[in-house]
């Protein structure tokens, strides 16, 4: 990393907004910003172990607050980035399940030939939802758990099945669609089981004296930064 370079370590769901904010900041200031994306469990492990060389971290609120409580981020430096809804994705041309209620979603999961979600925090919620529906054992033989959110869409894209259902963050699904992946954002989860994940940025303690990083955080929290995030699907 260059001496004047700012590094962001972020969860995957807000990745497009984080990247575009970073690019806009660089355009304004000339200061280069690099970014890396990881799942929330990896963020916890990396930052918690003191092995993170980034200046700024963007994580789910609960994770970000744990970082602050553990002294890994500067107290009071955080700001809400935005929120993302969990959603359903399928391959283009596949059967389209009814997402109108929790019960129709449950039946869609039971009748699907394959169910795909990730091991990150968003996927952990899906596993919990399925457990609360009482169908974990019934579908155990047809579940695929991927490492990342993007891997869910990659799996669907490569699949020959016509009745397969995947889950992920709406923003991540849209990123893959924009890249040309042959998948569809079918819709968000029904209201009864809706999942909204909120993300927060913060300054890592090792960069407490990095004024440029502080300025980037301020930009991310500004009206201009928030408009950039909203334009990428964050709410």
Please provide the spans of the model-predicted regions.
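Exported/periplasmic ABC-transporter solute-binding proteins
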Residues: 1-36, 41-48, 55, 61-70, ...
């Amino acid at each position: 990393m260059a001496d004047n370079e700012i590094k962001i370590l972020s969860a995957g769901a807000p990745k497009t907004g984080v990247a575009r904010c970073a690019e806009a900041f660089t355009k304004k200031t000339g200061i280069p910003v690099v970014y890396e994306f990881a799942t929330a469990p990896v963020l916890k492990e990396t930052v918690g172990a003191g092995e993170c060389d980034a200046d700024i971290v963007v994580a789910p609120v609960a994770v970000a607050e744990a970082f602050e409580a553990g002294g890994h981020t500067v107290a009071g430096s955080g700001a809400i980035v935005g929120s993302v809804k969990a959603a359903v994705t399928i391959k283009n041309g596949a059967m389209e399940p009814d997402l109108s209620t929790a019960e129709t979603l449950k039946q869609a999961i039971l009748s699907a030939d394959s169910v795909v979600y990730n091991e990150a925090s968003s996927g952990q919620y899906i596993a919990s939802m399925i457990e609360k529906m009482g169908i974990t054992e019934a579908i155990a033989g047809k579940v695929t758990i991927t490492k990342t959110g993007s891997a869910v869409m990659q799996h669907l894209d490569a699949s020959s099945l016509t009745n397969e259902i995947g889950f992920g963050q709406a923003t991540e699904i849209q990123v893959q669609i924009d890249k040309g992946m042959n998948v569809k954002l079918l819709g968000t989860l029904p209201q009864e089981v809706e999942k909204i994940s909120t993300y927060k940025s913060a300054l890592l303690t090792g960069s407490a004296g990095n004024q440029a990083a502080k300025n980037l955080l301020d930009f991310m929290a500004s009206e201009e930064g928030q408009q950039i995030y909203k334009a990428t699907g964050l709410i």
